[in-house]
Curated annotation (Swiss-Prot):
Part of the 50S ribosomal subunit. This is Large ribosomal subunit protein uL23cz/uL23cy. GO terms for molecular function: mRNA binding; rRNA binding; structural constituent of ribosome. One of its GO terms (cellular component) is ribonucleoprotein complex. It comes from Pelargonium hortorum (Common geranium).
Amino acid sequence: MDGIKYAVVTDKSLRLVSKNQYTFNVESGSTRTEIKSWVELFFGVKVIAMNSHRLPGKRRRMGHTMHYRRMIITLQPGYSIPSLINLII
């Protein structure tokens, strides 16, 4: 699970859970197939679609923060990630 950093809990990601879509921040160098295989292996679910976008790093007074990648993962109907649902409720 080196590629997945953490689950994202925002207003939009909470709305997407009802559509069986989960949002994760991942390492920017990870590929879509790596992330898909990690999610399927770790959570025991079937992934049918993945959307990703790269969020830019931000400038700071001293240096900058690194950019990262956000994945919205859609699961097959009947599958869910219960640990994230319990976190949200």
